């Protein structure tokens, strides 16, 4: 992978912030949380093995690649969440509809899904915490995340 200077500087700053090398990096195209927070745009996901970080960035909306300014501009609220890896009790895949219901209802109702469901339904990664809360991410590499964090 060929990374430009801005990307390299960004990753270096994140490593310095965590105090260790980033051993996991991914990008979630959808994000939800049992506290009702939901993002339909990307969230950067990274870890040094001790802490899992979810972070987003303010962006200009586009339609078919063309930037536009919405009439009602909602106030941007930065997402930057630090999750100690020891607080994570499970990482698995659930249906997106189950994740959306959990976000709406404020309680984690997700159950790991079968291979059949993985093939025929839209799925997301569920990160369940010991306190009963959960994060939901649409990422491509759930197995790599589980292996990296030993979950």
Q: Where do the language-model regions lie?
A:
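Anionic N-terminal interaction surfaces
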Residues: 1-67, 75-78
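Acidic, Ser/Thr- and proline-rich intrinsically disordered linker/docking segments
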Residues: 3-4, 8-9, 71-151
